[in-house]
Amino acid sequence: MSVTDRTTRTPQADLRLSQSSGSGMPIVMIHGSGSSRAVFARQFDSPLADAHRLIAFDLPGHGDSSDARDPAATYTITGLAQTTARLLDALNIGHAIIFGWSLGGHVAIELASFHHAVNGLVLTGAPPVSRGPLGMLRGFHANWDMLLTSKKVYSERDIERFEAFCFGGSASPSFREAIRRTDGRLRSGVAFGMFAGKGADQKQVVENAPFPVAVINGEHDPLVRLSYFETVAYASLWERCHVISGAGHAPFWEKPDLFNPLLSRFAEKVVKQSAVMPVRRTEAG
């Protein structure tokens, strides 16, 4: 298996991405706030990369991608989803499994509300909440560290706290630098947009999804309320809401030996179902 890196220009930003040489259905992986595509290293270093075309990219304002050309328009859930859609189109991806972690999960849900390529959705650390502050409060824990997700400028202490919040003691040394590099305007823009109720009603998108939806969370996730996921009336939930024992907010990084087989099994399900599903039409661009 080989991994190639490239930069793709979109109207929103220049996006740096990595992709494996696997020939199976693409799995597009979207990282969380303050992270980068490097967080999916343990999926690339697994049989998944041989079985599927794994694609991970740095969101605008993150990693090796450029900052947004128009921060006000791009640094929202809708703007990031539109950026992802442009990338899929540039890569000629007509069908894919979208795996979104944390912020990336919310971007994935928004993308699924309008883009025809989404054949399956994997959500980790990303509760599909209704619009506005009440929906947010139902899906997320209310604690002081959550305020970091909307803070524009980080001190070194903030960087340390956010790293521990997301990864506990499991972080790679490079993860702290990824947090430091992040364009803080994204944090404030995304948080404002979500509390203002902008974008799709994520709960409705997931409840009405015509494709399989996998929910895989960490047992000790400090950000999200695991009980909330059980209140969602999924039309197409795969198996059940899976919980990775002993993991926190990033179970795919902390416990890849448990996470990767679930992702592989879900992908097999999506491939089989996609063979008989009608082609979805793009509702918006």
Feature locations, PLM:
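Conserved loop-alpha-helix segment in the C-terminal half of the alpha/beta-hydrolase fold
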Residues: P47, P210-A247, W253, L258
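Glycine-rich nucleophile elbow surrounding the catalytic serine of serine-hydrolase chemistry
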Residues: G100-E110
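Catalytic active-site module of serine/aspartate enzymes centered on a nucleophile-bearing elbow/loop
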Residues: L237-G285
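Active-site loop/oxyanion-hole signature of alpha/beta-hydrolase fold enzymes
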Residues: I55-F99, P261
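Conserved HGGG/HGGXW glycine-rich cap/lid loop of the alpha/beta-hydrolase fold
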Residues: A13-D67
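Conserved alpha/beta-hydrolase catalytic His-Asp/Glu region
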Residues: G132-L134, K152-E207
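Flexible "cap/lid" loop of the alpha/beta hydrolase fold
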Residues: E110-S150
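Conserved alpha/beta-hydrolase "nucleophile elbow" surrounding the catalytic nucleophile
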Residues: H31-S33, A96, G100-S102
